């Protein structure tokens, strides 16, 4: 940006700000936009679960505890249980979005020594963010920890649904199975098989998402007003590029 506008004006581009003001506020925008996508996806999943719950309201199946036959239940009740869980996750995601929707342009160590708070307020309004009430040189990392913990819970709920389908699709049970498109191969060596590939992948992806929660929690503790230990986590990894 400085190179684009010319050498005379370039000295004003970064005036009063630190790199953290820019990077943290940009990260908030990214997470807010990601939240909007996730909220929309959860709403679509809720609609599908509700539809299946009503469709199979009277579809009887055997309930199990410890993996052993217990008492009769219905597929509708199973889908209703998943619906209730994802509805809680929708509320969690909305709360996490609100908590991460903050920006900070408070300068070195967060004192506004070289930047008017009115600038922070103006920029945050333009970006759809709320000024961080009390910042240091960074936006407090407990906000990010709560956000990624929420993603971990949602991933676990999706794995919960996927695991149920995987168990139901076993040959010995075969009470339900995931969608199998025309021409889809179950196995290169055993084409007669209909493997639960989608739900197995969801199970693996859930583990990956949960792995991001612990580093986010570790980042809550920083030295004084700022250190860069958190950048190892918040910066994109080569695998993300």
Residue map of PLM features:
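A helix-coil-helix interface module used to build multimeric assemblies
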Residues: 1-106, 112, 116-122, 131, ...
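Conserved small/polar residues in nucleotide/adenosyl-binding loops
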Residues: 233-240
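Short, surface-exposed loop/turn microsegments at beta-strand edges and helix-strand junctions
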Residues: 177-183
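A short secondary-structure junction motif
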Residues: 8, 52-59, 126-130, 168, ...
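A structural signal for small-residue-enriched, beta-sheet-centric alpha/beta enzyme cores
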Residues: 134-135
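A conserved active-site cap/scaffold subdomain adjacent to cofactor or substrate pockets
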Residues: 144-166, 184-232
């Amino acid at each position: 940006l400085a190179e684009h506008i010319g050498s005379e004006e370039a000295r004003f581009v970064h005036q009063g700000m630190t790199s953290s003001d820019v990077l943290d506020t940009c990260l908030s925008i990214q997470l807010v936009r990601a939240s909007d996508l996730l909220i929309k996806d959860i709403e679509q999943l809720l609609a599908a679960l509700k539809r299946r719950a009503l469709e199979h309201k009277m579809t009887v199946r055997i309930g199990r505890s410890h993996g052993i036959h217990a008492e009769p239940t219905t597929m509708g009740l199973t889908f209703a249980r998943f619906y209730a869980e994802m509805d809680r996750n929708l509320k969690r995601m909305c709360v996490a979005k609100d908590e991460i929707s903050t920006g900070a342009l408070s300068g070195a160590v967060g004192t506004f020594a070289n930047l008017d708070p009115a600038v922070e307020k103006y920029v945050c309004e333009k970006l759809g963010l709320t000024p961080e009430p009390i910042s240091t040189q960074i936006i407090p990392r407990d906000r990010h920890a709560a956000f990624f913990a929420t993603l971990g819970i949602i991933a676990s709920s999706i794995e919960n649904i996927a695991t149920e389908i995987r168990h139901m699709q076993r040959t010995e049970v075969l009470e339900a199975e995931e969608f199998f498109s025309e021409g889809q191969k179950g196995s290169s060596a055993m084409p007669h098989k209909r493997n639960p590939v989608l739900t197995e992948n969801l199970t693996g992806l859930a583990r990956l998402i949960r792995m991001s929660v612990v580093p986010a929690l570790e980042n809550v503790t920083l030295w004084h007003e700022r250190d860069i230990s958190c950048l190892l986590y918040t910066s994109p990894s080569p695998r993300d590029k």
